[in-house]
C-alpha cells in the first residue's frame, strides 16, 4: 500500500481516539516503567499514554514514515521509531504493550499474540483494540465492488491485506495460559455522521486504502463513485438527516503472570 495520509486520518481523530481512551481505562498496571505504543500512528494514543504515565519510558513504533512525522510534531519529546510489528522485538521487556487499531493489519494472530505476551516483563500488560468490521456493509461493499469486472484484475488481492479476526474464544484460549488476567469485550459504536461522503472519507484513510491504492486515477474515481452510492443505500438517513455508521471493535487486556 501507499503510505498513510495523516491529514485525512485526523479528520475523525476524536472518534478514532475514543476507543484508545476506553482501552487505556481498563489497563490496571499501577506504574509501568517501559511502555511501547505498537502501531502508534499519528501519536494520538501515545499522547494518552504520556498523560497517564508521565514518568514512564515511552516509545512509539509504526511502519508509516508519514504518520511518524506527524507523531514527532505532536510529541517532540517522545522517541518514535519506524518498525514492522510482524518482526518487531523489544530491547527491554515492556511493562505495557499498547496496540490500538494496529494488529488487524498483521497476519498470523495465533503466533503474534503469543509472541507479544512473551515479550512482556512479568506482570506486564498487553492492551489491544482492533476493528471487527469486515462483516459490516462498509467492508462487504468494498469486496463486492472489487470482484466486478471493472476492477477485478487490479484488486484481486486487496481483501488479503486484512485477515478476519479470530473468535473471542480463540483469543482467550491463546492468552489465558500465559496470563493471570484476561479482559475481553466488544463495543459496537454508532458514529453519527453528517453525510454519506463523511463515511467514505473516514474509510478512505483506513479500510479503503488496499482497494484504492492499486487503481489508476480514472479507475479510482469510478470505484469511489460506485462505492459512495452503495454506502448511501446501506446507511440510510435518520430522522434528523444524519446517518449512523456502525463500527464494532474488539478489546483485549491481558496481564502476563508474574
UniProtKB/Swiss-Prot annotation:
Q: Which reaction does it catalyse?
A: trans-aconitate + S-adenosyl-L-methionine = (E)-3-(methoxycarbonyl)pent-2-enedioate + S-adenosyl-L-homocysteine
The UniProt keyword set, sorted, is: Cytoplasm, Methyltransferase, S-adenosyl-L-methionine, Transferase
Q: Name the EC number(s).
A: 2.1.1.144
Which superkingdom heads the taxonomic lineage of this protein's source? Bacteria
Ranges in a coiled coil: none
Q: Which SUPFAM superfamilies match?
A: S-adenosyl-L-methionine-dependent methyltransferases (SSF53335)
Give GO terms: molecular function aspect only.
trans-aconitate 2-methyltransferase activity
Q: Which GO terms describe its cellular component?
A: cytoplasm
An example of a Pfam family matching this protein is Methyltransf_25
Q: Where in the cell is it found?
A: Cytoplasm
Choose any GO biological process term that the UniProt entry carries and state it.
methylation
Q: What does this protein do?
A: Catalyzes the S-adenosylmethionine monomethyl esterification of trans-aconitate.
- Protein family per UniProt: Belongs to the methyltransferase superfamily. Tam family.
Please report the name of this protein according to its UniProt entry.
Answer: Trans-aconitate 2-methyltransferase
Organism phylogeny:
Bacteria, Pseudomonadati, Pseudomonadota, Betaproteobacteria, Burkholderiales
Gene name on record? tam
Amino acid at each position: 500500500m501507499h503510505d498513510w495520509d495523516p491529514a485525512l486520518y485526523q479528520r475523525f481523530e476524536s472518534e478514532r481516539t475514543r476507543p484508545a481512551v476506553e482501552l487505556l481505562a481498563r489497563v490496571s498496571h499501577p506504574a509501568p516503567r517501559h511502555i511501547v505504543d505498537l502501531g502508534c500512528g499519528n501519536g494520538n494514543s501515545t499522547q494518552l499514554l504520556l498523560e497517564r504515565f508521565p514518568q514512564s519510558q515511552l516509545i512509539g513504533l509504526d511502519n508509516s514514515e508519514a504518520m511518524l512525522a506527524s507523531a514527532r510534531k505532536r510529541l517532540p519529546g517522545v522517541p518514535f521509531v519506524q518498525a514492522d510489528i510482524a518482526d518487531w522485538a523489544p530491547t527491554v521487556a515492556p511493562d505495557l504493550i499498547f496496540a490500538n487499531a494496529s494488529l488487524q493489519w498483521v497476519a498470523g494472530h495465533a503466533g503474534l499474540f503469543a509472541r507479544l505476551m512473551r515479550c512482556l516483563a512479568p506482570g506486564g500488560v498487553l492492551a489491544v483494540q482492533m476493528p471487527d468490521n469486515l462483516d459490516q456493509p462498509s467492508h462487504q461493499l468494498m469486496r463486492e465492488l472489487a470482484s466486478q469486472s471493472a476492477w477485478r484484475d487490479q484488486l484481486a488481492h486487496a481483501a488479503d491485506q486484512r485477515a478476519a479476526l479470530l473468535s473471542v474464544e480463540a483469543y482467550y484460549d491463546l492468552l489465558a495460559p500465559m496470563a493471570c488476567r484476561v479482559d475481553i469485550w466488544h463495543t459496537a459504536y454508532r458514529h453519527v455522521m453528517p453525510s454519506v461522503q463523511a463515511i467514505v472519507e473516514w474509510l478512505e484513510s483506513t479500510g479503503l486504502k488496499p482497494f484504492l491504492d492499486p487503481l489508476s486515477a480514472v479507475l479510482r474515481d469510478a470505484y469511489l463513485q460506485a462505492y459512495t452510492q452503495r454506502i448511501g443505500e446501506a446507511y440510510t438517513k435518520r430522522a434528523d438527516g444524519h446517518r449512523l455508521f456502525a463500527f464494532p471493535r474488539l478489546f483485549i487486556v491481558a496481564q502476563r503472570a508474574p
